[in-house]
Amino acid sequence: MIFIKTTASAGTFESNDCLVTIKNAETLSIEIESVVFDQFGDQIHEVVLKTLKTLNVKNIHVYIKDKGALDYTLAARIITACKRLGVYHD
């Protein structure tokens, strides 16, 4: 029996971390829920876009539940979730 993954996650909902959940989509969409969104929402969005561009991923829905993760943590979680879903392209 073959199972096709439709969603993948990486991370935790602990302090200074984030939980990234991704799923296949028709277009790129990003949803961010963060305790520091007012201060760093634009920066978080930029890290997501930059990381997805590096991975050459365009058609995906990204949901991020953030508890103050640093940029490199956020990028690592996105990369891991993409690899788990199988949408990572070299």
Model-derived features: where do they sit?
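N-terminal intrinsically disordered, cationic/polar leader segments
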Residues: 1-90
